[in-house]
Regions:
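N-terminal low-complexity, acidic/polar interaction/targeting segments
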Residues: 1-168
Length: 168
């Protein structure tokens, strides 16, 4: 883990996003419209973090806006974000109406290799074929990081919370 804390605007939602995962969002609240505008205009990331009751989960994922589907005249946005890095929140402060976290980024996974990975990859491809996924197999063959294998799966919130905590 890095000892350097970075400031990151936080967007609490009732979900856990994982690295490499895409999420379409409709941004309509004034404080998040401003945060989104800044992210788009200055190519700046923000963090998506699970909102739990009156608080927030201590971990989240840094996201970048990959695509702006629509910008409305009232400042609302339809966007697509992609999860990048897991972070741990060490503290928060308010910047106007936006919650800004002092975050520590956790180590990024590197690609898997070796005989054990080859066995895993073969099993993964067999499962895909068993369920009739026979398109884009080459794309599936290129996956090397565990989060890439989770793309497209509808996992329960509780399981995603466990997955994001594995780094600890």
């Amino acid at each position: 883990m890095s000892d350097t804390l970075q400031k990151l605007p936080l967007f609490p939602l009732n979900l856990v996003l994982l690295p490499y995962e895409h999420l379409p969002l409709h941004i309509f609240e004034p404080r998040y419209k401003l945060m989104t505008k800044n992210a788009i205009e200055h190519n700046k990331p923000f963090g998506i973090i699970l909102s739990e009751g009156k608080g927030v989960f201590s971990k989240g994922v840094k996201v970048c806006v990959e695509e702006v589907f629509k910008k409305y005249s009232n400042g609302e946005y339809d966007i697509l974000v992609k999860g990048e890095e897991i972070f741990k929140v060490k503290g928060t402060e308010m910047d106007g109406d936006t919650v800004v976290g002092d975050v520590e980024f956790l180590p990024t996974q590197t690609g898997m290799e070796g005989p054990q990975f080859q066995k895993f990859q073969e099993s993964y491809l067999k499962i895909l074929l068993k369920f009739g996924v026979d398109r884009d197999l080459e794309l599936h063959m290129k996956k090397k990081i565990s989060f890439e294998f989770l793309q497209g799966l509808q996992l329960p919130l509780i399981l995603k919370k466990e997955i994001i905590n594995i780094n600890d």
